[in-house]
């Protein structure tokens, strides 16, 4: 894949970046270099390599999957100026 001057101008317009005609060839070369690097990645043999979700080994902390009310309703509403049955009461703003 190759980026032409019109594509550089279009990308600049979409990104709302002012690009002069003198800058277009330089940016075209940089974008093409980036695309060439990405295309090289498709040549890497990854057969037998397990997909990674993180570069560092991590184990997810697990807990029992049980339904509860969170057991903190009183703590949540204790600093609210007005509550009723564990709900926040707010002033009416729409008539």
Curated annotation (Swiss-Prot):
What this protein is called in its record is: Aspartyl/glutamyl-tRNA(Asn/Gln) amidotransferase subunit C
Gene Ontology MF: a single term: ATP binding
Write out the function statement from the record.
Answer: Allows the formation of correctly charged Asn-tRNA(Asn) or Gln-tRNA(Gln) through the transamidation of misacylated Asp-tRNA(Asn) or Glu-tRNA(Gln) in organisms which lack either or both of asparaginyl-tRNA or glutaminyl-tRNA synthetases. The reaction takes place in the presence of glutamine and ATP through an activated phospho-Asp-tRNA(Asn) or phospho-Glu-tRNA(Gln).
Which reaction does this chain catalyze?
L-glutamyl-tRNA(Gln) + L-glutamine + ATP + H2O = L-glutaminyl-tRNA(Gln) + L-glutamate + ADP + phosphate + H(+); L-aspartyl-tRNA(Asn) + L-glutamine + ATP + H2O = L-asparaginyl-tRNA(Asn) + L-glutamate + ADP + phosphate + 2 H(+)
In Gene Ontology terms, what is a biological process of this protein?
glutaminyl-tRNAGln biosynthesis via transamidation
Q: Which Gene3D superfamilies match?
A: Glu-tRNAGln amidotransferase C subunit, N-terminal domain (1.10.20.60)
Per UniProt, subunit arrangement is: Heterotrimer of A, B and C subunits.
Top-level taxon of the source organism: Bacteria
> What family classification does the UniProt entry report for this protein?
Belongs to the GatC family.
Q: Does the keyword Ligase apply?
A: yes
State the gene name recorded for this protein: gatC
Organism per entry = Bradyrhizobium sp. (strain BTAi1 / ATCC BAA-1182)
Organism classification: Bacteria, Pseudomonadati, Pseudomonadota, Alphaproteobacteria, Hyphomicrobiales
> Using the chain's own numbering, where are the disulfide bonds?
none
This entry's Enzyme Commission designation comes to: 6.3.5.-
Q: Which UniProt keywords apply?
A: ATP-binding, Ligase, Nucleotide-binding, Protein biosynthesis
Q: Which Pfam families match?
A: GatC
